[in-house]
Design a protein with these regions (language model features):
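Internal alpha-helical scaffold of NAD(P)-dependent oxidoreductase catalytic cores
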Residues: 43-47, 128-220
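NAD(P)-dependent dehydrogenase/reductase Rossmann-like domain
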Residues: 268-302
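Short phosphate-binding/catalytic loops that engage adenosine nucleotides
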Residues: 28-29, 111, 158, 198
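Conserved dinucleotide-binding and phosphotransfer motif residues
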Residues: 26-27, 63, 109, 156
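Interdomain hinge/lid region at the active-site interface
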Residues: 216-274
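Rossmann-like NAD(P)(H) cofactor-binding subdomain of soluble oxidoreductases
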Residues: 38, 48, 52-127
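NAD(P)+-binding Rossmann beta1-loop-alpha1 motif at the extreme N-terminus of oxidoreductases
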Residues: 1-59, 88
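Hydrophobic Val/Ile/Leu positions in short beta-strands of Rossmann-like dinucleotide-binding domains
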Residues: 7-9, 69, 139
Length: 302
């Protein structure tokens, strides 16, 4: 490997800012940034020594050896198509869902193309900065650029995994399930606490230790051993009580609860704590329509 490349960023949102700051701290030369929002570019440049705000994406590409496209996914291809790329330069996007195929214009001009997706959540810039070191990074690139990206991941203290283009959508769907939909589940859970008089922030605070404990159990015990609760132990009576309470007080939450409980049955069976008979009873219970005719509640159709 030769000297570290001069890096530039097109896009100065949470991902770009966190990645630029972490790479700068790791000894990389971050020389330029351009963004549709000039204030965001100025904020990024102010936190990375030696980084200049440039007026256009083309100016960044002209100055840098390796350009990170850290725009929203739906803007990547448009940005790349609008740049005249130098042969031998490199362009990398940070989308988790899209492959390097969207960089075909740059590749046709002789640029190396790749993707580097941090498997991490970026709710705000400072939290992203704290979360990024040590994360998993999905890498897709051809050989020379691949080696550069693997070195970048190593320098960030991360763990690299390599994906084929056709694997990206499933990989990203898994990330969405774990990260984004956990937030949705917390919203649904706190909705129930609102029903018995709590404010949402207090409910979140009360439930967070349980969430952290679950994550700790998954880390320590793995799957399916980390599963606990009424489905895991075949507690049909408790599930019946839950369903009745939800049908009465929170019918909007009931379909999600039932579907998740059904999806939990094979996990509990694999753990060995749920008998086949109890699994059958729960499956029948969870498939039952709990809404009276004409109530307008959601009904299972499968």
């Amino acid at each position: 490997m030769g000297p570290k490349p001069k890096l530039g960023f097109i896009g100065a949102g949470r991902v770009g800012t966190a990645l630029a700051r972490c790479l700068g701290a790791a000894g990389y030369d971050i020389v330029a940034v351009a963004s549709r929002t000039s204030s965001a570019a100025e904020t990024l440049a102010a936190t990375v020594p030696g980084c200049s705000v440039l007026p256009t994406p083309q100016a960044v590409a002209d100055r840098c050896d390796l350009v990170f496209i850290t725009t929203p996914d739906d803007a990547i291809e448009t940005v790349v198509d609008g740049i005249a790329w130098r042969p031998g330069s490199a362009v990398v996007h940070t989308s988790g869902a899209k492959s390097t195929d969207i960089l075909s214009t740059a590749k046709a001009q002789g640029a190396e193309t790749g993707s580097l997706h941090p498997l991490q959540t970026f709710a705000d810039a400072e939290q992203a900065l704290a979360n990024l070191p040590g994360s998993v990074f999905a890498v897709e690139a051809e050989e020379e650029l691949r080696q550069q990206l693997l070195a970048i991941v190593s320098d960030l203290g991360g763990v690299a995994i390599e994906l084929r283009p056709e694997e990206k959508a499933l990989y990203h769907a898994a990330a969405v399930l774990v990260s984004n939909y956990t937030v949705t589940l917390m919203k649904l859970a706190t909705d129930l606490w609102l029903r018995f008089g709590w404010e949402r922030p207090a409910a979140v605070k009360a439930l967070l230790p349980l969430l952290r404990g679950t994550v700790s159990n998954i880390a320590a015990l793995g799957l399916p051993a980390a599963l606990t609760g009424p489905v895991a132990r075949g507690d049909v009576e408790t599930i019946e009580r839950h369903l009745a309470a939800l049908a009465e007080a929170a019918p909007d939450v009931l379909p999600a609860y039932k579907e998740l409980a059904l999806l939990t049955l094979p996990v509990a069976l694999a753990k060995g704590t749920l008998s086949d008979d109890d699994a059958a009873s729960l499956r029948a219970l969870l498939g039952r329509d709990l809404f009276p005719a004409g109530s307008g509640g959601a009904k299972r159709t499968s």
